[in-house]
Swiss-Prot record:
It is found in: Cytoplasm. This is Imidazoleglycerol-phosphate dehydratase. SUPFAM superfamilies: Ribosomal protein S5 domain 2-like (SSF54211). Keywords: Amino-acid biosynthesis, Cytoplasm, Histidine biosynthesis, Lyase. It comes from Prochlorococcus marinus (strain MIT 9211). Signal peptide: none annotated. Its main location: cytoplasm. Its EC number is 4.2.1.19. InterPro entries: IGPD_sf, ImidazoleglycerolP_deHydtase, ImidazoleglycerP_deHydtase_CS, Ribosomal_Su5_D2-typ_SF.
Length: 208
């Protein structure tokens, strides 16, 4: 199977201008500039540990706060992920990984099911990491999930340092997503579902 598994999204609102290019079968090349330094750092982890080629360029109303940029980047990444997966033929579909960072340990389990759901279990001690409000971590993943059709479970197993907890989360997410989106040679071009279809909830049903 020779699929071009890439997605590109250009999203413009009165609050932000976001461009995302995502390649699932990459080598971890990344170009990230969102105007939100900590978010940039986390997206670099996503690219590096998922081996995704990822470009994210965003300009937003960060003079107000980081909320709109953070959310709209998550939306665009989710849409690019959905586009790059297409009908999700031949993928493993499921992925899980537990990532440590010093005292922090975070587990991520996900399913490229087409059924958006987030179960979020991070307990981040501080309200900010640098200038980044830590409540935005959940908002980022909500945006990704709702626009990609992922079922995503995030569990904090240990950790006291806020930076370590969030970074371990993004690393675990990257590795779990890599496992789930990789192609299974035994499956060929079949869709990994007993129904014969995987699609995002609310989309038009396909004939099979």
């Amino acid at each position: 199977m020779s699929l071009q598994r890439t997605g590109e999204v250009h999203r413009v609102t009165k609050e932000t201008n976001v461009t995302v290019r995502l390649g699932l079968d990459g080598k971890g090349k990344c170009k990230i500039s969102t105007g939100v330094a900590f978010l940039d750092h986390m997206l670099q982890q996503l690219s590096s540990h998922g081996l995704f080629d990822l470009e994210v360029i965003a300009k937003g109303d960060t003079h107000i706060d980081d909320h709109h940029t953070n959310e709209d980047v998550g939306i665009a990444i989710g849409q690019a992920l959905s586009e790059s997966l297409g009908e999700r033929q031949g993928i493993n579909r499921f992925g899980h990984f537990s990532a440590p960072l010093d005292e922090a340990l975070v587990q991520v389990v996900l399913d490229c099911s087409g059924r958006p759901h987030l179960s979020y279990g991070l307990n981040i001690p501080s309200q900010r990491i640098g200038s980044y409000e830590t409540e935005l971590v959940k908002e980022f993943f909500i945006a990704v999930v709702n626009n990609s059709g992922l079922t995503l479970h995030i569990r904090q197993l240990d950790g006291t340092n806020s930076h370590h907890i969030v970074e371990a989360c993004f690393k675990a997410f990257a590795r779990a997503l890599r496992l789930a989106t990789e192609l299974d040679p035994r499956r060929g071009d079949a869709i990994p579902s007993s129904k014969g279809v995987l699609e995002q909830a609310g989309s038009k049903p396909k004939q099979i």
